[in-house]
Curated annotation (Swiss-Prot):
ADP binds at T417, N418, R420. The keyword Metal-binding applies. This is Bifunctional UDP-N-acetylglucosamine 2-epimerase/N-acetylmannosamine kinase. In the N-terminal section; belongs to the UDP-N-acetylglucosamine 2-epimerase family. An N-acyl-D-mannosamine 6-phosphate binds at G416, G476, R477, T489, N516, D517, G545, H569, E588. Its main location: cytoplasm. Bifunctional enzyme that possesses both UDP-N-acetylglucosamine 2-epimerase and N-acetylmannosamine kinase activities, and serves as the initiator of the biosynthetic pathway leading to the production of N-acetylneuraminic acid (NeuAc), a critical precursor in the synthesis of sialic acids. By catalyzing this pivotal and rate-limiting step in sialic acid biosynthesis, this enzyme assumes a pivotal role in governing the regulation of cell surface sialylation, playing a role in embryonic angiogenesis. CDD domains: ASKHA_NBD_ROK_GNE, GTB_UDP-GlcNAc_2-Epimerase. CMP-N-acetyl-beta-neuraminate binds at K259, E271, K280, H281. It comes from Cricetulus griseus (Chinese hamster). GO terms for molecular function: ATP binding; hydrolase activity, hydrolyzing O-glycosyl compounds; metal ion binding; N-acylmannosamine kinase activity; UDP-N-acetylglucosamine 2-epimerase activity. PANTHER family: BIFUNCTIONAL UDP-N-ACETYLGLUCOSAMINE 2-EPIMERASE_N-ACETYLMANNOSAMINE KINASE, ROK (REPRESSOR, ORF, KINASE) FAMILY. It catalyses: UDP-N-acetyl-alpha-D-glucosamine + H2O = aldehydo-N-acetyl-D-mannosamine + UDP + H(+); an N-acyl-D-mannosamine + ATP = an N-acyl-D-mannosamine 6-phosphate + ADP + H(+).
Length: 722
């Protein structure tokens, strides 16, 4: 059993209200069903699933071999605003009995429907933990208000995009309870292959229809502007009639205004028109084949801007219902769809095109992440939510714990040579530091990290330091969201695809943050060093290798594949020396400690290194410091090597200035003071006049990697938690 606070199965209640949310919840339900050792699944069906006019879609849940524990008729017919409110009230009346009987540990709620609001309200008031799927997104209607209200009620959050994650954090939700998983439906979309898709197309659109020669239309009422949305639907149907292509029209959802939309369809004879097929529901497996092979999709459904991008099918998004959604290049927005001609022009522009597939909303691996997240939920944790508010002026009252304890972080620095662990205070003071040689194997390294952290945590208690979390700085490419080292440099062996967060979190029972050493150096400068208060700056860290970090608008830049700010691997020569990354001519191949050691050995082997006043003991390896000492004592060859190294670093800085235009460049690490004047000379000689005013300084921080690792913990906890 994975951690959930006790030794029994986690009882999960999945409540589904309509055909759309079932398409997102079904992959999770299938995943839960495959792990009976961990989970018990109860399925509650309500809303439009149970209405004949909307296809009695509860049947597809039964066809998927799920046992429906409870059916709740909660829809008050009328399809107007009052009916929606009454439906919420009816659900609130019926749900308590169901939840009292089922006694779930957690309820999974999806999206932004009024039914989901009733579910979340009931569960929250009955002290049942809530996992909200697809929180943090922005559309453009009352759905936004409902979605964000559910976010406030939910205890845990699964979001689909980085922007949604940032919205949740901005809404003061606890970052530890947010999972960026991607959309569950993408697990199915990206694996959907059906060689017999033409039989599906013919079944729904007729035997004479060809692939990419039909349209799928799905339009819903906009409850905040019903009259305008009805008019827009009428214009859409007129444009489709004029466009004269076979069209599959799905009936709208049950929101206020849907009855009027159906009247418009019948008034225009859509159900009997030879070019139209009007249907209440299409099973999701078949629906994705229909949109994947359509010439175009038109309407205002979230499906158009979210799921259809996985196939590159052209989409025409009408009106403002999805105005805030992130979309791929396959989506053409017609926000003011106020004339038939405008919609018709959009059809002519989009129909038949093929766009690149878009994975904005998922990579096909959401469900495994969600199941892992569910298993990690500790039922012994307090049920009451905590909100993480931005810093505010503290109360003048005092807290005895704050007086007696020093709020601190455990910081870990995994370098090419040494492994260091430190207790770092909120003010950036290193209270205690431990150093060991970095082992060569994965098993020895993980074991030593855990041992050193446990010892440091025990020492922190004696020193009256309250450890708030663990921050880890490591060489290589890091996914900070998952706490995984994706790919390391050659300096740290057996360090690819390494999950650092899980073993430390499980051992220490503390939150764990992980990032690249260059990024940590930049974060250290932002919190404790010369970057404090600077909006845009770049840090270059010189050590065994060369790393860096970029702060833009006060935020650290990670890049789309967590590869931003690999500044040591900027190429400054087409025929330069080989680099540890596998390329050649990189800054690191010239200016790193490794590069200087390489050149020092060459000089020493040729008896050209030592000058009067210096010696190297036989048992001491020749290194960069010997080269620097020789240069200081007048060794011209050593001086030339240092000048070449500094010039390479300077050229890299010039490239950064021309790309990022920062106001400040901070050189950090043991070699920074030896390079600073050369770098400034190169900027004067090579940089354009518009960027020459940049400040280039040497860091005054002694341990930037440790301080940066600590800052990940301390920055998070400076937000007041209530």
């Amino acid at each position: 059993m994975e951690k959930n606070g006790n030794n029994r199965k986690l009882r999960v209640c999945v409540a589904t209200c309509n055909r759309a949310d079932y398409s997102k919840l079904a992959p999770i339900m299938f995943g839960i069903k495959t792990e009976p050792a961990f989970f018990e699944l109860d399925v509650v069906v309500l809303g439009s699933h149970l209405i004949d006019d909307y296809g009695n879609t509860y049947r597809m849940i039964e066809q998927d071999d799920f046992d429906i524990n409870t059916r709740l008729h909660t829809i008050v017919r009328g399809e107007d605003e009052a009916a929606m409110v009454e439906s919420v009230g009816l659900a609130l009346v019926k749900l308590p009995d169901v939840l009292n009987r089922l006694k779930p540990d957690i309820m999974i709620v999806h999206g932004d429907r009024f039914d989901a609001l009733a579910l979340a309200t009931s569960a929250a008031l009955m002290n049942i933990r809530i996992l909200h799927i697809e929180g943090g997104e922005v559309s453009g209607t009352i759905d936004d208000s409902i979605r964000h209200a559910i976010t406030k009620l939910a205890h845990y959050h699964v979001c689909c995009t980085r922007s949604a994650e940032q919205h949740l954090i901005s809404m003061c939700e606890d970052h530890d309870r947010i999972l960026l998983a991607g959309c569950p439906s993408y697990d199915k979309l990206l694996s959907a292959k059906n060689k017999d898709y033409m039989s599906i197309i013919r079944m729904w659109l007729g035997d004479d229809v060809k692939c990419k020669d039909y349209i799928v239309a799905l339009q819903h009422p906009v409850t905040t502007d019903i009259k305008h949305s009805i008019k827009m639907f009428e214009l859409t149907l007129d444009a489709l009639i004029s466009f004269n292509k076979r069209t599959l029209v799905l009936f709208p959802n049950i929101d206020a205004g849907s009855k009027e939309m159906v009247r418009v369809m019948r008034k225009k004879g859509i159900e009997h028109h030879p070019n139209f097929r009007a249907v209440k529901h299409v099973p999701f497996d078949q629906f994705i084949q229909l949109v994947a092979h359509a010439g175009c999709m038109i309407g205002n459904s979230s499906c158009g801007v979210r799921e259809v991008g996985a196939f590159g099918t052209p989409v025409i998004n009408l009106g403002t219902r999805q105005i805030g959604r992130e979309t791929g290049e396959n989506v053409l927005h017609v926000r003011d769809a106020d004339t038939q001609d405008k919609i018709l022009q959009a059809l002519h522009l989009q129909f038949g095109k093929q766009y690149p597939c878009s994975k904005i909303y998922g990579d096909g691996n959401a469900v495994p992440r969600i199941l892992k997240f569910l298993k990690s939920i500790d039922l012994q944790e307090p049920l009451q939510k905590k909100f993480c508010f931005p810093p505010v002026k503290e109360n003048i009252s005092q807290d005895i714990d704050h007086i007696l304890e020093t709020l601190s972080a455990l910081a870990v620095d995994l370098g090419g040579t040494n492994l260091r662990v430190a207790i770092v205070s909120m003010k950036g003071e290193i209270v205690k530091k431990y150093t060991q040689f970095n082992p060569k194997t994965y098993e020895e390294r993980i074991s030593l990290i855990l041992q050193m952290c446990v010892e440091a945590a025990a020492e922190a208690v004696k020193l009256n330091c309250r450890i708030l979390g663990v921050g880890i700085s490591t060489g290589g490419r890091v996914n900070p969201q998952e706490g995984i080292v994706l790919h390391s440099t050659k300096l740290i062996q057996e360090w690819n695809s390494v999950d650092l967060r899980t073993p430390l979190s499980d051992t220490l029972h503390l939150p764990v943050w992980v990032d690249n050493d260059g990024n940590c150096a930049a974060m250290a400068e932002r919190k404790f060093g010369q970057g404090k208060g600077q909006e845009n700056f770049v840090t270059l860290i010189t050590g065994t290798g060369i790393g860096g970090g970029i702060i833009h608008q006060h935020e650290l830049i990670h890049g789309s594949s967590f590869c931003a700010a690999e500044l040591g691997h900027l190429v400054v020569s087409l025929d330069g020396p080989d680099c540890s990354c596998g390329s050649h001519g990189c800054i690191e191949a010239y200016a790193s400690g490794m590069a200087l050691q390489r050149e020092a050995k060459k000089l020493h082997d040729e008896d050209l290194l030592l000058v009067e006043g210096m010696s190297v003991p036989k048992d001491e390896p020749v290194g960069a410091l010997h080269l620097i000492q020789a240069a200081k004592l007048g060794n011209v060859k050593a001086q030339n090597i240092l000048r070449t190294a500094g010039t390479a670093l300077g050229l890299g800085v010039v490239n950064i200035l021309h790309t990022m235009d920062p106001s400040l460049v901070i050189l950090s690490g043991v070699l920074a003071s030896h390079y600073i004047h050369i770098v400034k000379d190169v900027i004067r000689q090579q940089a354009s006049s518009s960027v020459q005013d940049v400040d280039v300084v040497v860091s005054d921080l002694v341990d930037p990697a440790l301080l940066g690792a600590a800052s990940m913990v301390l920055d998070y906890t400076t937000r007041r938690i209530h």
